[in-house]
Regions:
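Helical "substrate-binding/catalytic lid" subdomain
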Residues: 162-274
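Rossmann-fold dinucleotide-binding core
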Residues: 3, 93-169
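NAD(P)+-binding Rossmann beta1-loop-alpha1 motif at the extreme N-terminus of oxidoreductases
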Residues: 1-63
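Hydrophobic beta-strand scaffold residues
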Residues: 27, 47, 112-114, 155, ...
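Rossmann-fold NAD(P) dinucleotide-binding segment
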Residues: 51-112
Length: 286
């Protein structure tokens, strides 16, 4: 099976590398940044110059681009000269409606689409330990599985088209809420003179443990705005009132990797315009 990747930034490049190393066929790559594609040549991944080239070369095409409009634009371009039966697996995180629009565009030319967004971020991509949350027909997902398996610890079929994106959004909601909850809770520890990193290690053996806390050092806080926009849009469409997530949407945007490092390993941590230190080291500052 020949695989193609559209979008070979840090995530896409790592995923393509695993498919090349573990797969059973050629791997092709396209990116608007030619240098990103050329950087993969020493792994045996073949560069292509246009989206038309990749749609003619690959049986399964993994799309991991930035946003909804890019997914639609890429699907449109892939479909123009696409080979009937070619399967597009959207690994980007987008709104479920975007998946349905993409599927309509592709179906008009005989191409197939599934949603296959991934969890565990850049670390999971580098280690080949992502979780693929898939929406689409069982047949299409099984056809994509030989490619998805190469970079995934597990491939889950959640339901019809769009359900993978909903599942990814639910995961993101819990992840970002945990980021805020972990930060605020450990601020209490720091304020009262407890080593936050040592307490984190203890909490990972207690009922309060969560996956976000375990991997907190690697959280990059790259996409909270996009992720929460999708979550709150789904809440509105579902006529749901979710007051907690209105607060999470605001608070998670104040967190940074440096702030987490300061909280866990430093003498002070920033939060909401203040600098929090232990009481016996001068109070909360700010």
């Amino acid at each position: 099976m020949k695989a193609g990747f559209v979008g070979v930034g840090a995530m896409g490049a790592a995923m393509a590398g695993h498919v090349q190393a573990k797969g059973q066929g050629e791997v092709f790559a396209y990116d608007v940044r030619r240098e990103a594609v050329d950087a993969l040549a020493d792994q045996g991944i073949k560069p292509v110059d246009t989206l038309a080239d990749i749609t003619r070369a690959a049986d399964v095409i993994v799309v991991i681009v930035v946003d909804d409009q890019q997914v639609l634009d890429v699907t449109e371009a892939l479909s123009v000269d696409g080979v009937e039966g070619t399967l597009i697996a959207v690994a980007a995180t987008v709104h479920p409606d975007t998946m349905r629009k993409a599927a309509e565009i592709a179906a008009a030319k005989g191409l197939r689409v599934i949603d296959a967004p991934v969890c565990f971020g850049l670390y999971g991509a580098k280690e080949g330990q992502l979780a693929s949350l898939c929406g689409g027909s069982a047949e299409d997902i099984e056809d994509a599985r030989p490619v998805l398996d190469c970079y995934s610890r597990a491939v889950h079929h959640i339901g019809p088209l769009g359900c993978g994106q909903i599942a990814k959004t639910v995961n993101n909601m819990l992840h970002w809420a945990n980021c805020v909850a972990n930060y605020e809770a450990l601020l209490i520890a720091k304020r009262f003179g407890i080593d936050a990193q040592k307490l984190r290690e203890v909490l990972l053996q207690c009922p309060a443990r969560n996956g976000t806390l375990a991997d907190w050092d690697s959280t990059r806080f790259t996409w909270p705005i996009k992720d929460m926009d999708i979550a709150l849009a789904l809440a509105r469409e579902g006529e749901l009132t979710l007051p907690l997530y209105g607060q999470v949407d605001h608070l998670v945007q104040t967190l940074t990797p440096d702030g987490v490092k300061g909280l866990l390993y430093g003498d002070a941590a920033p939060y909401l315009g203040r600098t929090v230190t232990a009481k016996d080291e001068g109070g909360h500052g700010g």
